[in-house]
Amino acid sequence: MDPSIIEFIGEKCMISIIPNFSNEPLHLIYGPVGPFRAGFPVFVPLWMATHLRKQQKCRIVPPEWMDMDILEEIKEEEKRSKFFTKMPCEHYMVVAQLVMSTAPDDVPRCEELRTVIKDIFDIRESKLRTSIDAFIKGEGTYAKLDNLTLLEIHSVRPILPYSLDHIARYQRTATASQRDTSMLSASMAGSSSGPNSNSLFSQ
């Protein structure tokens, strides 16, 4: 999946804004948004929030999970656990990047948040690569990759073809070995049932 498509999907996440204008509801393809009342929070798609913010028509309210205490806790849990922590937002990287790049003044401790979110992403990416490597070396048939986001899966796409090719070769080798073993067993069974099968012990 192309990164632009992942961003497009992430931009559909709903986020709160505080508009500085009033307007009746906007009727979009997937439903109405609004009404807009100056000074009152309203949830809109992320793409609309960034568009209005660039026009200085609103202030973006960062999601609750964009908080240093929450993100530091997620970071520590990610480091402790061998599994992937369930993230508070499936598109956390897309949302964080767009909000912080569009409206840094609306995000308390913006640079610190940017750093800890990047740390979380790097830890998860490293864990994902390690999981895939262990999966290959262990000749496994499946890997537990729950709670990954689309962007994280996309980040390891370059090594997936090699991984799948390695697994396919292993499976072909295992199948051939099993077939040869079965043929040898059948051949030995046939020989042992012949008239001279006990000739070595009959002397």
UniProtKB/Swiss-Prot annotation:
Q: Keyword set for this entry?
A: DNA replication, Nucleus
Compositional bias of kind Low complexity = 182-203
Q: How does it assemble?
A: Component of the GINS complex which is a heterotetramer of Sld5, Psf1, Psf2 and Psf3.
This protein is called Probable DNA replication complex GINS protein PSF2
Can you tell which superkingdom this protein's organism belongs to?
A: Eukaryota
- Location of this chain's protein in the cell: Nucleus
**What Gene3D superfamilies has UniProt attached to this entry?**
1.20.58.1020, 3.40.5.50
**A GO-annotated cellular component:** nucleus
